[in-house]
């Protein structure tokens, strides 16, 4: 119930985070999320980690969101990854440690000893070295006698099976603490010096007082490199112990082999206590037996905290993680170089080199035996602290590799970049080995072997990192490959290229409507179609879906120019058949008249025309379809001519109805208005005016004065007797304008300028207005 309620609360807070952009509200919701008991299942189901991680660049709540994501990263289990990484690491490191690796360390001692001896001697006193020896030897004594015989039998039994160049679990553990499994050759080199050093811890008490400067140099390096990798101080202890390995007498080798396993157990126990102290935050005073051990562990814990505390803050931010990782890689490589040189700072003249060669395989065999026994499950006790140590180290060193899967980030990209780093460090290691080989002639063979080992290692690591990146390249090839059509050979007979496979994809678009009726219905009905409404916007551009043959091109030209075909010569009917099928009956008849040879072949074409124009007619006996069509066509034309003649004769014999008659036949017609205005303007209307107006005698003056004028105007060609005739006349309304017009057209009087009607109206209004005042 509690898990379900927490899941519901997380979902509600996640929804509020996505909906509310207020910084105060966001901070409030993030604080509530930090209080809730979040589990890995809740993170996977809700995806709240991705939501909170999206606020890491926010101005107000960015720091709190990064801290919360870093806190949730600790919840993610990395046991599976750590076990798989340990196995991969051991496989990569196997058969890569030559027996004469210790010889190179001894050669480097002399060059580095003189430069560091004065500075190292003033750091600590011999008592401090003795305290360190006590601190390292006290936890080992209870285990020394109990496990000596058992581990010796296991070592003998596994010595028969294991190869001479196998990797030890202790070195692989420490190598895993410092870096991820695809480690660099510098780390491999430091592990070589680390593996035999762990078996030589009790020998420090038997060393001479003259070797104090190596202890002080190691202590000074442990203090100066607190900001470096978490295992800096422990690795310097081991390097210091390896510097005195050659000084030990030959008769103490058996004691060293017996006490090697007990010391490894003590180191694992101390590392287990250190990891628990880092996780729980408890003090180290309850865990360790002596006060000197407390001080040393506190110093190591502070160095680890200084390193891992910024690493957790930076791990949530991918942009800042990569530069810091590069800086740590550079610092680690520099420290490894110093440690390799610093191992030889306190070395004097000891046993010859063959003794060192004998010791290296023995320690490797003993530790290989321990690996085999752990794999068989015989020693479950020592395996448990190592698993816890790898879990703790993975939690601090590589939290993003497992937590990013919950945030749906991409992992192969980081693996690819790590491979590049290992290859670059491999080149630097190769250069270092070549310098060492030039310094002495004894180590020439070993210097030639190590670059080969490094090359093999880089070749193994690069495929391991390149394999996860291969699926990223597959989706990029989205474009389909074009068909690889080879160019045809040039021949006299031309053949076109085959049509592409992409052409059929255009055909469904062209055949959207199978008939004009469907297209018309789709365009003008009320229902919607999947495609747009077909609207005619001009003829579309004609295109050829494929290359046409020469024969097809010629037939196409002939179909488009049938009216230009006359004599075809000796061209057979089979060639012209597609063209003749497109001909109308008139065009076909004309071509046959020009080419009588085709008449025998075109009977089927005339049959088609007969069925189309004369559906119910059948040919007579011994009559071809062509003859039938011509006969029926002539009969139809004759009927049409007869019908036309009948209609024409019917219209000719029809009685005429109303006829149009001219008005003013016996009088002068009134000219149109525009003509009259032009006549008045230019004085061209005087031709109709008589030259001399004759006035009737006095008896007729008593009547209308307009009558003689009208008579004279209408009969100006008549004699004076006719003027005396007082016959019927038209109305006076018509005569008055005629008389006035005759008077106005008098050329003896000047033409009066007529005022426009609108102007006359305006002038009249002005006169009436001014007259009232």
Curated annotation (Swiss-Prot):
Give the Phosphothreonine positions (modified residues).
Answer: 390
Q: Where is this region: BC-box?
A: 549-558
Q: Does the keyword Acetylation apply?
A: yes
Domain of life according to the entry? Eukaryota
Per UniProt, the keywords (alphabetical) are: Acetylation, Nucleus, Phosphoprotein, Transcription, Transcription regulation
Query: According to the UniProt entry, which residue ranges have a biased composition of type Low complexity?
Result: 162-174, 704-718
Annotated positions of the N6-acetyllysine modification = 430
Q: Which residues carry this modification: Phosphoserine?
A: 82, 195, 309, 379, 515
Show which residues constitute the signal peptide: none
For this protein, the record's InterPro entries field holds: Elongin-A_domain, F-box_dom, RNA_pol_II_trans_fac_SIII_A, TFIIS/CRSP70_N_sub, TFIIS/LEDGF_dom_sf, TFIIS_N
In this chain, composition skew of type Basic and acidic residues spans 81-105, 136-156, 248-264, 270-303, 316-338, 354-375
Which residue intervals make up region (Activation domain)?
A: 521-680
- Enumerate the spans annotated as TFIIS N-terminal domain: 4-79
This protein's assembly is summarised as: Heterotrimer of an A (ELOA, ELOA2 or ELOA3P), ELOB and ELOC subunit. Part of a multisubunit ubiquitin ligase complex consisting of elongin BC complex (ELOB and ELOC), elongin A/ELOA, RBX1 and CUL5. Interacts with ERCC6; the interaction is induced by DNA damaging agents or inhibitors of RNA polymerase II elongation. Interacts (via BC-box) with CUL5.
Please state what the protein is called. Elongin-A
Q: Which gene encodes it?
A: Eloa
């Amino acid at each position: 119930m509690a898990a379900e309620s927490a899941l519901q609360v997380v979902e509600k807070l996640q929804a509020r985070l996505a909906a509310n952009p207020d910084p105060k509200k966001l901070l409030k919701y993030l604080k509530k999320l930090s209080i809730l008991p979040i589990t890995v299942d809740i993170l996977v189901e809700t995806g709240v980690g991705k939501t909170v991680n999206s606020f890491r660049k926010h101005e107000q709540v960015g720091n709190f969101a990064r801290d919360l994501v870093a806190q949730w990263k600790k919840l993610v289990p990395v046991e599976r990854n750590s076990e798989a990484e340990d196995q991969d690491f051991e496989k990569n490191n196997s058969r890569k440690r030559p027996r004469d690796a210790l010889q190179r360390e001894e050669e480097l001692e002399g060059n580095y000893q003189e430069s560091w001896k004065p500075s190292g001697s003033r750091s600590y006193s011999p008592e401090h070295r003795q305290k360190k020896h006590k601190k390292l030897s006290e936890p080992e004594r209870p285990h020394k006698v109990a496990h000596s015989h058992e581990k010796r039998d296991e070592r003998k039994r596994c010595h028969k099976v294991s190869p001479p160049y196998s990797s030890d679990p202790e070195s692989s553990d420490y190598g895993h603490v410092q870096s991820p499994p695809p480690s660099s050759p510098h780390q491999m080199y430091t592990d070589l010096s680390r593996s035999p050093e762990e078996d030589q811890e009790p020998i420090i008490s038997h060393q001479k007082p003259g070797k104090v400067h190596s202890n002080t140099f190691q202590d000074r390096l442990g203090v100066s490199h607190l900001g470096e990798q978490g295992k800096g101080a422990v690795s310097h202890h081991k390097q210091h112990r390896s510097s005195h390995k050659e000084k030990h007498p030959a008769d103490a080798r058996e004691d060293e082999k017996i006490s090697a396993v007990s010391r490894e157990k003590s180191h694992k126990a101390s590392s287990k206590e250190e990891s628990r102290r880092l996780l729980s935050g408890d003090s180290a005073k309850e865990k360790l037996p002596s006060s000197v051990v407390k001080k040393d562990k506190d110093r190591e814990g502070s160095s680890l905290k200084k390193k891992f505390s910024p690493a957790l803050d930076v791990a949530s931010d991918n942009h800042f993680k990569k530069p810091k990782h590069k800086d740590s890689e550079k610092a680690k490589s520099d420290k490894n170089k110093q440690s390799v040189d610093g191992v030889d700072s306190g070395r004097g003249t000891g046993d010859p080199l063959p003794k060192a060669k004998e010791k290296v395989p023995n320690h490797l065999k003993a530790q290989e035996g321990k690996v085999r026994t752990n794999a068989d499950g015989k020693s479950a006790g020592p395996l448990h602290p190592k698993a816890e140590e790898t879990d703790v180290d993975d939690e601090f060193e590589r939290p993003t590799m497992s937590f990013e899967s919950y945030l749906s980030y991409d992992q192969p990209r980081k693996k690819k970049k790590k491979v590049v780093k290992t290859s670059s460090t491999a080149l630097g290691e190769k250069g270092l080995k070549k310098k060492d080989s030039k310094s002495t002639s004894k180590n020439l063979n070993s210097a030639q072997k190590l670059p080969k080992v490094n090359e093999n290692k880089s070749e193994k690591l690069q495929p391991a990192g390149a394999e996860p990146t291969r699926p990223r390249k597959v989706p990029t090839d989205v474009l389909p490959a074009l068909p690889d059509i080879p160019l045809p050979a040039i021949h006299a007979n031309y053949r076109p290229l085959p049509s592409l496979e992409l052409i059929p994809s255009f055909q469904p678009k062209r055949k959207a409507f199978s008939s004009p009726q469907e297209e018309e219905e789709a365009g003008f009905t009320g229902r919607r179609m999947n495609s747009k409404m077909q609207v005619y916007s001009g003829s579309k551009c004609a295109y050829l879906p494929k290359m046409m043959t020469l024969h097809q091109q010629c037939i196409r030209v002939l179909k488009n120019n049938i009216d230009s075909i006359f004599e075809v010569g000796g061209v057979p009917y089979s060639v012209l058949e597609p063209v003749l099928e497109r001909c109308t009956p008139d065009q076909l008849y004309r071509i046959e008249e020009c080419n009588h040879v085709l008449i025998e072949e075109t009977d089927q074409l005339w049959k088609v025309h007969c069925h189309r124009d004369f559906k119910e007619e059948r040919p007579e006996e011994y009559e071809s379809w062509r003859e039938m069509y011509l006969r029926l066509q002539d009969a139809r034309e004759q009927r049409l001519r007869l019908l036309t003649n009948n209609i024409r004769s019917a219209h000719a014999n029809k009685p005429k109805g109303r006829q149009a008659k001219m008005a003013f036949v016996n009088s002068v017609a009134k000219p149109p208005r525009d003509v009259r205005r032009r006549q008045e303007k230019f004085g061209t209307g005087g031709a109709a005016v008589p030259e001399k107006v004759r006035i009737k005698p006095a008896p007729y003056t008593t009547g209308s004065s307009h009558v003689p004028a009208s008579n004279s105007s209408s009969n100006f060609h008549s004699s004076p007797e006719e003027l005396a005739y007082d016959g019927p006349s038209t109305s006076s309304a018509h005569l008055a304008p005629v008389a006035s017009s005759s008077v106005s057209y008098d050329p003896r009087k000047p033409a009066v300028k007529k005022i426009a009607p609108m102007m006359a109206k305006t002038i009249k209004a002005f006169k009436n207005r001014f007259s009232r005042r």
